[in-house]
């Protein structure tokens, strides 16, 4: 396998917005190069997680090695490193781009450039990749290749004279794409004689072999049986198995600079082989690790609690297993007076949170309660200490804090002109600060806003899609923290604060949110045998309250006529019982109530 000269290797990835046909295009490339046996071929071959196929999105990274004989008669090795297209996974995208020399920019010829495409293109340009524009879905009646070419040239500034017109579904233009990869993407640098440096761009956990690491050799050569060191963690391992991904694993003896492959070395947890880390040899280590390794920081936090307290250990195990595959998932145990024991989890964004939650419920059969997502606030205390708070119930009391700062993002929305008004209204209602508006070709507009992340985190994306009938797309990145007049809104049920319902909101919105919350909870919490007051409070001031009336048993059913004092005695007895119950009774808050809080924040 290693007799292929470096000049005949091409490493590329595919950049695209969700649903622009990236996975289908990857399928066609695998088919045309004969990489996958026609009998094994299925739609979206590389998306092999059930959830990915169902949602039609790529979540985990995949890689495949293809052999292609070009029209010039030479045989080339093409390594495709598939990238996820969603904004939450941009750290995965940046790693896989670092392992490539070129990228196919796939744009839907009927829709044009979308916000997410832009975000990934800028990442690719930062890594100095050769970008080949591909206009996909040209078989659609609504395709306008010339308009889209002009749009790519105008927005991204790429020369589109070389753009390939293709239809992955119909198999049109696939060979042209392969030819342009061979001729336009530069080969890797020939650095076989240097000390080994390889970039880890993905890893997953295999129950039998431990962690399987996907990597790209940047310098040097790696052989089976070598003792390797991971530069960020400093740990050492011996390689048991080394191979290439074609796309199924195929063992080989050695891999040299420029090649992409996998290794197994009895590594116990994915946390030991962090994505973006550098592999080097233990006896002849490289001086410097490869640049660009950062740990993905969670942006969104929420509490996960099992509905059945006995499942706590199962939940811990499930999270540990997911953590093996997903180094960006953070979790730590927490207790809540209303929900018992559970975990505080950190995610990259909302989609990431939904996927983890769905996988826990699906693959591990857990029944979960999820609290409202919150972002990380920066609180400066009176003493001048700076605290990072990811859980509203941990916020210090007002007299101890100097200021609260919240994360702000720059948000870019690309939308047809018709929906500009309604989207601007949406952004303003979410405390957005208008920054810029640019007109693109053919009646499309870019809107740029600065906005608190907390306002995007719940349902901004859904709201934007429904207001623009699905045509708008968005992309955001963090720009820093800013101080705001934020307060902690407590919800008291039966005079007890429920920590998992607490939220940090802007003072101007507090009354409105509190009012809406208590009335929603009134509808959702079932009636008990005693009266339940529900209150929303800021500090000690109650700003809204509702109460759920008690259920009453008809204690007078068996009194026909007779003395009124007899009836009064029974009613008094019932009243005393209710009073006692109220003092010691627990209110069961159903999962719907917590979910309502999620949805309500911005209604």
Curated annotation (Swiss-Prot):
Similarity comment: Belongs to the TRAFAC class translation factor GTPase superfamily. Classic translation factor GTPase family. LepA subfamily.
One Gene Ontology cellular component annotation held by this UniProt entry: plasma membrane
InterPro entries per the UniProt record, alphabetical: EF-4, EFG_III/V, EFG_V-like, EFTu-like_2, G_TR_CS, GUFP, LepA_C_sf, LepA_CTD
Entry superkingdom: Bacteria
Keywords in alphabetical order: Cell inner membrane, Cell membrane, GTP-binding, Hydrolase, Membrane, Nucleotide-binding, Protein biosynthesis
Name this polypeptide is given: Elongation factor 4
Enzymatic class: hydrolase
E.C. no: 3.6.5.n1
Span of domain tr-type G: 7-189
Job description of the protein: Required for accurate and efficient protein synthesis under certain stress conditions. May act as a fidelity factor of the translation reaction, by catalyzing a one-codon backward translocation of tRNAs on improperly translocated ribosomes. Back-translocation proceeds from a post-translocation (POST) complex to a pre-translocation (PRE) complex, thus giving elongation factor G a second chance to translocate the tRNAs correctly. Binds to ribosomes in a GTP-dependent manner.
CDD domains: EF4_II (cd03699), EF4_III (cd16260), LepA (cd01890), lepA_C (cd03709)
Keyword Protein biosynthesis assigned: yes
Localisation: Cell inner membrane
GO annotation (BP), single: translation
PROSITE patterns: G_TR_1, G_TR_2
A molecular function (GO) term: GTP binding
Membrane topology per record: Peripheral membrane protein
Species of provenance: Thermosynechococcus vestitus (strain NIES-2133 / IAM M-273 / BP-1)
Primary residence: membrane
